[in-house]
Amino acid sequence: RCKTCSKGRCRPKPNCG
């Protein structure tokens, strides 16, 4: 996955693609 989610927050990962 390219996104990391925790406690209702989702962020795109810096090293993706």
UniProtKB/Swiss-Prot annotation:
MF terms (GO), sorted A to Z: potassium channel regulator activity; toxin activity
Site, Key residue important for binding to potassium channels: residue positions: K3
Keywords carried by this UniProt record: Disulfide bond, Ion channel impairing toxin, Nematocyst, Potassium channel impairing toxin, Secreted, Toxin, Voltage-gated potassium channel impairing toxin
Note, other: Negative results: does not show effect on rNav1.2/SCN2A, rNav1.4/SCN4A and B.germanica Nav1 (BgNav1), rKv1.4/KCNA4, rKv1.5/KCNA4, rKv2.1/KCNB1, hKv3.1/KCNC1, rKv4.2/KCND2, rKv4.3/KCND2, and hKv11.1/ERG1/HERG (3 uM toxin tested).
UniProt effect for mutating R9A: 12-fold decrease in potency of inhibition of Kv1.1/KCNA1 and 21-fold decrease in potency of inhibition of Kv1.6/KCNA6
UniProt protein name: Potassium channel toxin AbeTx1
Annotated localization: Secreted; Nematocyst
Family indicated by similarity: Belongs to the sea anemone type 6 potassium channel toxin family.
Segments passing through the bilayer: none
Free-text note on domains in this protein's UniProt record: Has the structural arrangement of two alpha-helices stabilized by disulfide bonds (CSalpha/alpha 2(S-S)).
S-S bonds: C2-C16, C5-C10
Major place of residence: secreted
One GO cellular component, as annotated: extracellular region
Site (Important residue for binding to potassium channels): R1, K7, R9, R11, K13
Functional note: Potassium channel inhibitor that is the most potent on Kv1.1/KCNA1 (IC(50)=671.95 nM), Kv1.2/KCNA2 (IC(50)=167.36 nM), and Kv1.6/KCNA6 (IC(50)=115.68 nM), and less potent on Kv1.3/KCNA3 (20% inhibition at 3 uM) and on shaker IR (15% inhibition at 3 uM). It inhibits potassium currents, not only by blocking the potassium current of Kv1.2/KCNA2, but by altering the energetics of activation of Kv1.1/KCNA1 and Kv1.6/KCNA6.
